[in-house]
Amino acid sequence: MNIIDDGKSEEVVEVDPPKPITPKSDNSTSQSNNPQESNKMRAQIARVTQRSKQEVPHYYLSTEINMDKALEIRSQINSKLENQNIKISINDLIIKAAVETLKKYPIFNSRYENNSVITNDEINISIAIALDDGLILPAIIGCNNKDIKDISNSTKDLVERTKNGKLTSAEYTKGTFSISNLGMFDVNNFLAIILPPQTSMLAVGSVKKTPVVGVDDSISVSNIMHASLSADHRVTDGAAGALFIAELKNNLENPVNLII
């Protein structure tokens, strides 16, 4: 029931109750109930995600990351790179932090195929990019050999070519670890579905000013970001995942590790 107040009168008027509506006797179907065929991209997403949830035993670990130092060092880097037309984003720092973490814990940079775990030599970070027809996760190839500037340039180039339909076969198929960032949509936290045959995926939310209690019980305000790791339980256990996400947290809270 909708109630509309026009603000013009406080008079109460008695009205007859509405008569019941008799359903039409024809066999027409409401338009809202008509099935809609999925487009090709939506259908592919459905197949991949359904397969992942049915076949991959996911486990999830989440943490809060203080991004104060990361934001500070990002500002410093961008000031120095201003004349080079390079601007480092928060997502660039997250990608670089994930790469350094994967170097220390390479089991999360593996794939699961034919009941075997294969650790990939190269770190190719797949990033979730939203398009009009759905979602795609192309890969930045060779992140293990890229510094923060290279990652920034590669990411911008990849996003542009994704939107123009100019990806290479390797960028479509050779990802080894995925990152989905919904921070730009004001999402705090979420859990991602692993993209097989990859065995891990990182989900990050927005950076928000949040009250933080210090070791001396003092309260301050910091820039906090939630991050969640989705991992394949056939490949790793919770303890290994905890070490991974703790290292990722350390890399972002001490970002000097990302630029030296």
Where are these regions (language model features)?
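C-terminal catalytic/motor cores of large multi-domain enzyme assemblies
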Residues: 2, 7-260
